[in-house]
Amino acid sequence: MKHIVKHIHFVGIGGAGMSGIAEVLVNLGYQVSGSDLARNAVTERLEALGARVSIGHDAANIEGANAVVVSTAVRSDNPEVLAARRLRVPIVPRAVMLAELMRLKQGIAIAGTHGKTTTTSLVASVLAAGGLDPTFVIGGRLTSAGANARLGMGDFIVAEADESDASFLNLYPVIEVITNIDADHMDTYGHDFARLKQAFIEFTQRLPFYGSAVVCIDDANVRQIVPLISKPVVRYGFAADAQVRAENVEARDGRMHFTVRREGREPLPVVLNLPGLHNVQNALAAIAIATDLDVADAAIQQALAEFNGVGRRFQRYGEIAAAGGGAYTLIDDYGHHPVEMAATIAAARGAFPGRRLVLAFQPHRYTRTRDCFDDFVNVLSTVDALVLTEVYAAGEAPISTANGDALSRALRAAGKVEPVFVATVDEVPDALAKLARDGDVVITMGAGSIGGVPGKLAQDTQQKG
């Protein structure tokens, strides 16, 4: 690619999916430029590495580019896209550029509706501990690396495979993981769940004859497609027929302790530095891959025990001063689908037994709120206190029957929790100040702008201290 394409431009370079690819390309020696609507820590990091970042979208930004990379979030009337068309500069979907990176190494692609980012991070961490020095591209900031991407010198590249826009079908890895299959982003599949499952089957057909599909057999929908997968399958989970299985699982001090059973191997005791049964499953995927690649058991154990997490995935911000005295424990999480939210809430209950759980939640997308409305009511009703914001639109038109007010009214009617509704995320800190008490566990949750709230709360506590 490099003898023809030397300068690559990213429209929306600050996004989680785009920035990682951009960073790897910078480190490979390409000239990288990009644009976004605002500066953030990611764009500043890319600039420090040598990328040229413009704030705002303008046709002039693509000057000299041999290719323009876009995600599905970029509109067709974006001025940089229009300029690329006019100048006949190739417009490359993000997933196609990721596929090009995978051609340079042996790809390990992590797919599934939930758990992709954490699983990708665990796989990368375990392979790194085993001396394989992988390249990785992750949808969140891996704490130990201080970034969401890294160019390694080893043979493997570990990356998330996105089913939300069916772009994972552009990838041709040698190992695939399927964590679960759930109803989300159903507009991509014509609101036909059978089409979604078929897409995952087609994903496995991208594997070479020597490849393998590593699948969570605990998930009912994954179990249904296993007989239809024509390539070698490795099953992981808690189920009796899992080839990589967790037993004797116990939550202690915010960690998960368990024993791994693998066919033909000695039992492996593991301490995972993450809470929650769902994270045990994510770790099993990493263990299955590491075992296949002959990573030493001691390296697996060390990587999982020392895993420092991923940004916005059960990210702990420490103790925050409560308005009435004392302090509460603050956690931030990216969860935005009821299944993810339930897993995070269960993990918090397990990590902090007996403590009052306060949730500040910003729904993400009106269509998701509409499609999962009853499930949102059910999962939000399981917390002890709730701050609820208006829906983060993500470019969608409002739906009056699926907005924050409608969700609040449904929660009150259910009668299990009394939501405190605020119109904007800016009002969340004040609402939490009135609600959170000494000893509480407070979780800020959502895929939108609520991600900026915990940093503000932590900063306010430091200033007061």
UniProtKB/Swiss-Prot annotation:
The lineage's top-level taxon is Bacteria
Give the catalytic activity: UDP-N-acetyl-alpha-D-muramate + L-alanine + ATP = UDP-N-acetyl-alpha-D-muramoyl-L-alanine + ADP + phosphate + H(+)
Localization per record: Cytoplasm
| Entry-linked Pfam families | Mur_ligase, Mur_ligase_C, Mur_ligase_M
- Its Enzyme Commission number? 6.3.2.8
SUPFAM superfamilies referenced in this protein's UniProt entry, alphabetically: MurCD N-terminal domain, MurD-like peptide ligases, catalytic domain, MurD-like peptide ligases, peptide-binding domain
What GO molecular functions are on record for this protein? ATP binding; UDP-N-acetylmuramate-L-alanine ligase activity
Instruction: Please state the pathway this protein functions in, per its UniProt record.
Output: Cell wall biogenesis; peptidoglycan biosynthesis
Q: Provide the primary localization.
A: cytoplasm
| Cellular component GO terms, alphabetical | cytoplasm
> Quick one: which residues bind ATP?
112-118
EC class name: ligase
UniProt record, GO biological process: cell division; cell wall organization; peptidoglycan biosynthetic process; regulation of cell shape
Task: Give the residues annotated as coiled coil.
Answer: none
Keywords recorded for this protein, A-Z: ATP-binding, Cell cycle, Cell division, Cell shape, Cell wall biogenesis/degradation, Cytoplasm, Ligase, Nucleotide-binding, Peptidoglycan synthesis
InterPro entries for this protein: Mur-like_cat_sf (IPR036565), Mur_ligase_C (IPR004101), Mur_ligase_C_dom_sf (IPR036615), Mur_ligase_cen (IPR013221), Mur_ligase_N (IPR000713), MurCDEF_pg_biosynth (IPR050061), UDP-N-AcMur_Ala_ligase_MurC (IPR005758)
For this chain, the family text in UniProt reads:
Belongs to the MurCDEF family.
Instruction: List the NCBIfam families.
Output: murC (TIGR01082)
Q: What does this protein do?
A: Cell wall formation.
* The protein, known as: UDP-N-acetylmuramate--L-alanine ligase
Q: What phylogenetic lineage does the species belong to?
A: Bacteria, Pseudomonadati, Pseudomonadota, Betaproteobacteria, Burkholderiales
Q: Which gene encodes it?
A: murC
